Amino acid sequence: MEALGKLKQFDAYPKTLEDFRVKTCGGATVTIVSGLLMLLLFLSELQYYLTTEVHPELYVDKSRGDKLKINIDVLFPHMPCAYLSIDAMDVAGEQQLDVEHNLFKQRLDKDGIPVSSEAERHELGKVEVTVFDPDSLDPDRCESCYGAEAEDIKCCNTCEDVREAYRRRGWAFKNPDTIEQCRREGFSQKMQEQKNEGCQVYGFLEVNKVAGNFHFAPGKSFQQSHVHVHDLQSFGLDNINMTHYIQHLSFGEDYPGIVNPLDHTNVTAPQASMMFQYFVKVVPTVYMKVDGEVLRTNQFSVTRHEKVANGLLGDQGLPGVFVLYELSPMMVKLTEKHRSFTHFLTGVCAIIGGMFTVAGLIDSLIYHSARAIQKKIDLGKTT
């Protein structure tokens, strides 16, 4: 018993008799409010604990021979799909000219609404032109390429075949009305029909994981004296409006929390024949989810430059939208981890202890202030 008596001396929480305790309305109000605040803070701490935290690390990128996937969704409200060409090239010398695989073009009217394709007839003003039936032609025919024949191109049975043969030769495709295939297919009428339309380009490119560029520009692209050029003979520089809206542009798959800086970027061309250049720095990124799934992707930063392209060759540039990218030699590794349970317990204890302490101080202040005022009232000293 004597030992228990000595032990009681260490009690930091001495108790008072129930008869000496006073309960007040102010104390009840403080208790209820502090209890609700404590509950809200606890739920907030619990929600924070149930989320994952991401730990970044930096490494040297040692990956070799990988492909880079570029996701694209860009709108050109004043550039018809028939005029627009998409090309990609890199420092290794690989080129993808007038890319069509994995990339799609959607025609848009002047209000930005998708235009449904009409397979049988096109309306040009008040004149209706019936599109020819290709099945009516001899399937074994071999039509002229108009001087652009090559070892692998002996016959040009369609207007597109002639354009491709001209492109390989590096010749400008000036007057389609002199080409029988184009006249038969109504090429000029189609171009005229789409004159006031826009175009949405969406899909993806797969390129080598080296520095390079891809661009959207009017005219058929080809090589001339080892220089990449576009045939703009039939356009006129004053008619080229490169206003564009980038709905989405990313390098690889999205991961939680990623920010693609070019998403929802709207750029209005201040004048005709503008050249827009986006200089992109791509940072390889590995995102490791808490369940063990590994996502290899990229994040990037970008700066923009624009100028008027008055010429078709040389330093004056080419009208269009150019994305020039280079890859960082460093790789970022992002790892998801569960939050510490001991940290959660510490936070909960801090909330409970802090609220009890603050509530006790407020209750004591209210109680003693009320008693002091009541004493003055009883003594008749209040004014």
Swiss-Prot record:
Positions in the Lumenal compartment: 47-341
Membrane topology classification: Multi-pass membrane protein
Phosphoserine sites (modified residues): 116
GO biological process: endoplasmic reticulum to Golgi vesicle-mediated transport; positive regulation of intracellular protein transport; retrograde vesicle-mediated transport, Golgi to endoplasmic reticulum
Site (Ubiquitinated): 8
InterPro entries in alphabetical order: Erv, Erv_C, Erv_N
Topology Cytoplasmic: residue spans: 1-25, 363-383
Phenotype upon changing residue 6 to R: Reduces MARCHF2-mediated ubiquitination and degradation. No effect on interaction with MARCHF2. Reduces MARCHF2-mediated ubiquitination and degradation by 90%
UniProt cross-references to Pfam families, sorted A to Z: COPIIcoated_ERV, ERGIC_N
TM region(s), chain numbering: 26-46, 342-362
Modified residues (N-acetylmethionine): 1
Required for MARCHF2-mediated degradation: annotated segments: 1-25
GO cellular component, as recorded: COPII-coated ER to Golgi transport vesicle; endoplasmic reticulum; endoplasmic reticulum membrane; endoplasmic reticulum-Golgi intermediate compartment membrane; Golgi membrane; membrane; retrograde transporter complex, Golgi to ER; transporter complex
Result when mutating residue 23 to R: No effect on MARCHF2-mediated ubiquitination and degradation
Effect seen on changing residue 8 to R: Reduces MARCHF2-mediated ubiquitination and degradation. No effect on interaction with MARCHF2. Reduces MARCHF2-mediated ubiquitination and degradation by 90%
Family of this protein: Belongs to the ERGIC family.
Protein name per UniProt: Endoplasmic reticulum-Golgi intermediate compartment protein 3
Species in which this protein is naturally found: Homo sapiens
